[in-house]
Amino acid sequence: MGSAATSPPPSMKLAQEDLKRVAAHMGGAAASPPPSVKLTQEDLKRVAAHRAVEFVEPGMALGLGTGSTAAHALDRLGDLLRAGALPGVAGVPTSLKTELHATRVGIPLLPLGGDGGPSRIHLSIDGADEVDPDLNLVKGRGGSLLREKMIEGAGEKFVVIVDESKLVPRLGCTGAVPVEVIPFGAPHTLGLIRKVFDGLPGFHARLRMVRKDAEEDTPFVTDNGNYIVEMFFEDGIRGDLHNISDQLLRITGVVEHGMFLSMATTVIVANKDGTITVMDKKN
């Protein structure tokens, strides 16, 4: 994307309450807010999400992300739709949770493909668990990585909204890198995933487990009826990410992984000092 792509239409300005809290500045530099402003992490998520919604234009088909940051974008879209500011806008949800949220705030929904689906997805807006210097992402710690990657990979533009705690030098630095696997033979698939990183110091992988009430731990189940393997790295993933991606996807039983490589076109970062940084994908 060039610099022109980061200029929102005049009608999509931030809400006044957000303008009072933070001054946005495009192109990677950050504007200074009043020194008295104190923003919580939720405030930062909200400001970044509202900034991303400025990219939405009437008639667009959107990819609707999942997670706490994306939820703020859904709320903002609902407000604008009810105000009549975004006629013809509809979205494809990346999870059942997002489907319910979007329905609640009045966002019309579309399927991905088929007779009722859009001919194209113009723009997707979603959060991320990690963003590296090349705008590669880790996503899906909430378990929605497969639908997220399908929908966001089908779009023309993918705007990612994060606070600065999500910026990392390497993917895998701050927590699990998820891999969605089919339930049949999941322990076997887990063993094959471990072999990809055999001998790597500090690496370990496990099935994500959940406990319901006082019952025993059971595998976490995604919206697609699959399990999640969590991969942990002592100091992040080193090496060729695309090669590692290929090795994982060649394992029979692996459905998809949570490394979103070369997919984000714009990343909007809300900094803890109240400034916003917008980073565009290099051509």
Pin down the residues of each PLM region.
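Glycine-rich beta-strand-to-loop/alpha-helix junction loops that act as flexible
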Residues: 61-69, 73-74
